[in-house]
Design a protein with these regions (language model features):
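Extracytosolic ligand-binding ectodomains
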Residues: 1-214
């Protein structure tokens, strides 16, 4: 989904891929999709170990005036913190940098990762869920608290969304009908659109595009 979003962007931009050594495979996949992109990898020390870091000079004079798109592929919180800090330092009135990842994971949510930097970089990723709108969905939240005496967790909301979605689909026909499970729906925090895989399982392939902004 995030790749399709970037491909559909008609604005002129330069593209870059930054990854640690464990994520070289996905970096190479992105490179094949965007052959003009430039790859950067985390530094290796004298012992041959991945330091999971870059330094300012590694990226100095890299970015151009206008829009620069950077894919960051890693599962290491320290690398996210390191790279987002360096990228943030290059942003100015003429150089714009937007940060993307094809694999949003806990590394991007660590205590050492600056949300201010991610906002400045307009960090974007695909997700099957989003945060509930406490204003728009106040009625549901109030009713939940009234019944259970605590604010609904993401697990409670997901359980509600999945159950409600399945009941609606069942009421409209056979779940094995591709015209039924192929319809996209969304509720408080979750979006659903199912597709049968080659192994026979039915997978949820719906995504939100999440973007960090000020």
């Amino acid at each position: 989904e995030i790749i399709s979003h970037v491909k559909s962007d008609t604005k002129k931009s330069k593209k870059y891929i930054i990854s640690d050594l464990k994520s070289i495979e996905i970096s190479n996949k992105i490179k094949r999709i965007f052959p003009e992109s430039k790859q950067f990898f985390s530094k290796i020390n004298e012992s041959g170990d991945d330091t999971k870091t870059l330094v300012y000079d590694d990226l100095d004079s890299t970015f151009v005036k206008g829009k620069n798109i950077v894919f960051l592929e890693t599962k290491e919180q320290g690398f996210v913190s390191n790279v987002s800090s360096i990228l943030n330092s290059f942003i100015n009135d003429t150089i714009k940098i937007e940060l993307f990842t094809t694999n949003k994971n806990n590394a991007f949510e660590g205590a050492n990762v600056s949300n201010n930097y991610l906002s400045n970089l307009k960090f974007q990723y695909a997700s099957t869920n989003k945060k509930i709108d406490i204003v728009e969905d106040k009625s549901f939240i109030d009713k939940f608290i009234s019944n259970y005496n605590y604010f609904p967790s993401k697990y409670s909301i997901r359980a509600y969304d999945i159950t409600y979605d399945l009941l609606l689909r069942i009421s409209n026909g056979d779940l094995n009908d591709e015209n039924i499970f192929g319809i996209e729906s969304q509720y408080f925090e979750n979006k659903f659109r199912y597709k049968r895989s080659s192994s026979g399982s039915i997978d949820n392939i719906a995504n939100y595009l999440i973007k960090h902004e000020d």
